[in-house]
Amino acid sequence: MKIYPQSFNSSNYNIVQCWAAGIQVAALNIQATDDDYTLFDKVFFKQNKNLGYVEKPKKFHIESLKIEKYDKPHFILEVSIKIIFALSKIIQFTGMKIKKSEFMTMSVYVLGTNADKQSNMEYKFELIDGFIFTKIKDNRIMRFNIYESDVGGLMFKIKYNNVLVARACIPFCIMKEGYRRIPIYSNNCAEFKSTCIIGLFSKI
């Protein structure tokens, strides 16, 4: 399979569609590092020690499974998550100075197949950058219904005064229940070693 750019910005690049179809290996010519799928690709391959492949979805390993065009999706996974706090101050690692009149927000949404993206809402939170921790105002439990958990994940975007300053991503296939650490990355996919997001995950 080859994917050619629609224009100069390669806007038709979507690795999830390849993975969902069972394509295991792809050569990627990434010309920018500030795209959601670039970070998603990096985090996904990290689970395989950067060997450069993603296993086929589980449904392709079932010989008796027949998928028709209008069948309902299989392997439904219900996930709930509550963000506890962000360890250490996020903004100080971006080199930006905070003013009291400005604010931070974090959005959380599903990055995956079209069915998963369309059936789940995007959550938005206001962040309060404290002396030690970045706290979350009006924290609430987020719930997601996932059809293709093998090739999907959660994307976190942190904005300061409406400017994107940090991102995070966690694939559903490596998500475990309990308190978990989610690494935070810059816009260029460089990991901030001294800060992270702490979340409480549960699978229903």
Sequence positions of predicted segments:
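Long, highly charged low-complexity segments enriched in Glu/Asp and Lys/Arg with interspersed Ser/Thr
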Residues: 39, 46-65
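Catalytic and substrate-binding clefts that recognize carbohydrates or anionic sugar/phosphate headgroups
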Residues: 1-40, 45-48
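Eukaryotic intrinsically disordered and solvent-exposed regulatory patches
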Residues: 8-14, 63-70, 89-95, 125-129, ...
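Solvent-exposed serine/threonine-rich low-complexity stretches and specific carbohydrate-binding patches
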Residues: 118-133, 170
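C2/C2-like lipid-binding beta-sandwich modules
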Residues: 59-112, 143-149, 203
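Exposed aromatic-hydrophobic patches
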Residues: 133-147, 169-170
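C2-type phospholipid-binding modules
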Residues: 37-44, 147-204
